[in-house]
């Protein structure tokens, strides 16, 4: 298959392999210390890093369609994010002949056969088989080929090969601009020339259809499959937090707002709230829209230079401490990033880790939970560039809930609906 075959593959995905997906795709295309409120109690072992690049996949959509104007660029960060969808949980490699279980988990056919062993003879009682991820009973007869995933993996490989071509390394690909940070030339004069190009201001890309990546609808639809539809759990919220009526937004309540009664699940010191949905297996992601103090002052006309926007977003285990001082680090069952003073920090121990240097925090942060692999990663919600990843050596071992913290009445945190 060649790169020119991708449009036909996308059309086949919509009309044959994924009944009903075509219409969906068409719709898509139309306590405060000096160091900050969340860092004073960070204690415990630092997270281990994993250098292995994760994978990428894409789901079909018609090319050359009218796209959203906030489309991310098709670059290495996007490839790294999407590749997870093409990775078999058992072997850690790309899917080969994927099969789908009754519980909706997919595996390589050969990997699953090795895990389950040889089926017994017909005259003997069959041993029970279960999903390696969630443990639900899955009879052998329930196996079926995952044709859609097989095509997505093939498209993913084509995308990676295209990004590796010399033309892609130069920085452009059929109307889409590709960042070169992930594929710089070897050390020497070529690298110095590359950095000099970065120092020259470049105009922002046009918002016309031709200036958006051709494969953005494919990528967006594929990511949409993992995005969880979340709401907040008011029963866990600190008494000074104000939850919106649709339970998708949280901010610090203004002075004088009546406080609800305390409860065993509420945080009593950390201004935090958990999501109503918890996850004990699989891969899940959600996006949070933040608002920094500067933008809030601009909209309100106020000038309060002595105040900063403080927030943290991420994930917390069901065992996270609700009363008293909370250890905001992986040892305390918290994996989060903090926006403070116009900067973004990973809440690592013993000290937080500054992310992005002098760059301001992204306005939209994507949290990616891979329960079986013990990984919680954070991405720029627009460009899908990786910001930071916490990596454990074992599965997380308990239900994980989305975590939202804020102590600024002007800077609410908002869950981005899954259909956005």
From Swiss-Prot:
- The primary gene name is RNF39
Q: Which Gene3D superfamilies match?
A: 2.60.120.920, Zinc/RING finger domain, C3HC4 (zinc finger)
Reactions this protein catalyses: S-ubiquitinyl-[E2 ubiquitin-conjugating enzyme]-L-cysteine + [acceptor protein]-L-lysine = [E2 ubiquitin-conjugating enzyme]-L-cysteine + N(6)-ubiquitinyl-[acceptor protein]-L-lysine
Q: Which residues form the B30.2/SPRY domain?
A: 210-420
Domain of life (superkingdom): Eukaryota
What EC number(s) has UniProt assigned to this enzyme? 2.3.2.27
- Which PROSITE patterns does the record match to this protein? B302_SPRY, ZF_RING_1, ZF_RING_2
- Annotated region Disordered: the residues are 166-186, 246-265
The name on file for this protein is RING finger protein 39
UniProt subcellular location: Cytoplasm
Pathways involved: Protein modification; protein ubiquitination
Q: Which GO terms describe its molecular function?
A: ubiquitin protein ligase activity; zinc ion binding
Task: Quote the cellular component terms of the Gene Ontology held in the record.
Answer: cytoplasm
Query: Function, please?
Result: Plays an inhibitory role in anti-RNA viral innate immunity by targeting the adapter DDX3X and promoting its 'Lys-48'-linked polyubiquitination. Alternatively, enhances the cGAS-STING pathway activation by promoting 'Lys-63'-linked ubiquitination of STING1, facilitating the STING1-TBK1 complex formation and STING1 activation.
Q: Per the UniProt entry, what are the Gene Ontology biological process annotations, in alphabetical order?
A: innate immune response
Enzyme class, one word? transferase
Does the entry feature the keyword Nucleus, yes or no? no
């Amino acid at each position: 298959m060649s790169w020119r075959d991708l449009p036909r593959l996308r059309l086949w995905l919509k009309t044959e392999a994924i009944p009903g997906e075509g219409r969906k795709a068409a719709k898509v295309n139309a306590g405060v210390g000096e160091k900050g409120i969340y860092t004073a109690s960070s204690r415990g072992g630092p997270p281990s890093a994993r250098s292995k690049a994760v994978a990428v996949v894409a789901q079909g959509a018609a090319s050359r369609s009218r796209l959203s104007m906030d489309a991310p660029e098709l670059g290495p960060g996007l490839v790294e994010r999407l590749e997870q969808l093409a990775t078999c949980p058992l072997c850690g490699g790309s899917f080969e002949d994927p099969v789908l279980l009754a519980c909706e988990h997919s595996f390589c056919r050969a990997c699953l056969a090795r895990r389950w062993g040889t089926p017994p003879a017909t005259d003997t009682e069959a041993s029970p088989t279960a999903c390696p991820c969630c443990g639900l009973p899955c009879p052998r007869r329930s196996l079926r080929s995952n044709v859609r995933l097989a095509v997505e993996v093939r498209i993913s490989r084509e995308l990676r090969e295209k990004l590796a071509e010399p033309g892609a390394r130069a920085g452009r690909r059929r109307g889409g601009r590709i960042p070169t940070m992930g594929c710089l030339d070897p050390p020497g004069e070529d690298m110095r020339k590359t950095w000099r190009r970065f120092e020259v201001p470049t105009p922002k890309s046009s918002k016309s259809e031709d200036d958006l990546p051709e494969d953005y609808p494919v990528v967006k639809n594929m990511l949409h499959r993992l995005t969880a539809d979340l709401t907040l759990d008011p029963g866990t919220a600190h008494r000074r937090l104000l939850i919106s009526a649709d339970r998708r937004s949280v901010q610090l309540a203004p002075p004088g707002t009546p406080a609800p009664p305390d409860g065993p699940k509420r945080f009593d010191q950390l201004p935090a709230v958990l999501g109503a949905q918890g996850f004990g297996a699989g891969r899940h992601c959600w996006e949070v829209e933040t608002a920094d103090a500067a933008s809030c002052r601009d909209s309100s006309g106020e000038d309060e230079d002595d105040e900063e926007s403080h927030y943290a977003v991420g994930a917390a285990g069901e065992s996270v401490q609700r009363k008293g001082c909370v250890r905001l680090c992986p040892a305390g069952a918290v994996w989060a990033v903090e926006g403070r003073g116009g900067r973004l920090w990973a809440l690592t121990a013993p000290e937080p880790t500054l992310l992005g240097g002098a760059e301001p925090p992204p306005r939209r942060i994507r949290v990616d939970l891979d329960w079986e692999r013990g990984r919680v990663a954070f991405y720029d919600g627009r460009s899908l560039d990786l910001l930071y990843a916490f990596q454990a050596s074992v599965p997380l071992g308990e239900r994980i809930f989305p975590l939202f913290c804020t102590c600024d009445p002007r800077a609410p945190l908002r869950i981005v609906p899954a259909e956005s």
